[in-house]
Amino acid sequence: MNLNATIFFQMLVFFVLGWFTMKFVWPPLTKAIDERRQKIADGLAAAEKGKADLAQAQARVSLIEASAKSETHARIIEAEKQAASMIEQARREAEAERARIVAQAAQDAAQEVQRAREALRDDVAALAVKGAEQILKREVDARAHAELLNQLKAQL
């Protein structure tokens, strides 16, 4: 095995190339690889944080949904109670109005009956006077006997 100058020169070039690569090329490559590794790690951490945030958000949404559902249910129950109360109040008011109308109608009927009785008394008194007039064949003075007619009305 001959060791000649070419091999030494190639070895020298190889070591110079190795030193140059280690000194000037390798550090930016390792730096780029480390930065890329760090970006990947940051991305994975952000993804994990995003997953955790998503889980928390879903939990909050579930709580908000449950709260809204219970609140809606409570509002529906309250609205139903209020509607029932309003219906009951309207029913009471309608009953009171009906009672008032019936009482007014009864009062009007009683007044009409009273008026009819008064008119009937007047008619009966007039007929009695005419009958007495015809029986006696003379005219009876109505003014003179007004008190007698009023007593007759009171008795009827």
From Swiss-Prot:
Record keywords, A-Z: ATP synthesis, Cell inner membrane, Cell membrane, CF(0), Hydrogen ion transport, Ion transport, Membrane, Transmembrane, Transmembrane helix, Transport
GO CC, any one term: proton-transporting ATP synthase complex
Keyword Aminoacyl-tRNA synthetase included in the entry's annotation: no
Main location: membrane
InterPro entries the UniProt entry points to: ATP_synth_B-like_membr_sf, ATP_synth_b/b'su_bac/chlpt, ATP_synth_F0_bsu_bac, ATP_synthase_B_chain
Gene3D superfamilies: F1F0 ATP synthase subunit B, membrane domain
PANTHER family: ATP SYNTHASE SUBUNIT B, ATP SYNTHASE SUBUNIT B', CHLOROPLASTIC
Protein name: ATP synthase subunit b
Source organism per UniProt: Bordetella pertussis (strain Tohama I / ATCC BAA-589 / NCTC 13251)
Name of the coding gene: atpF
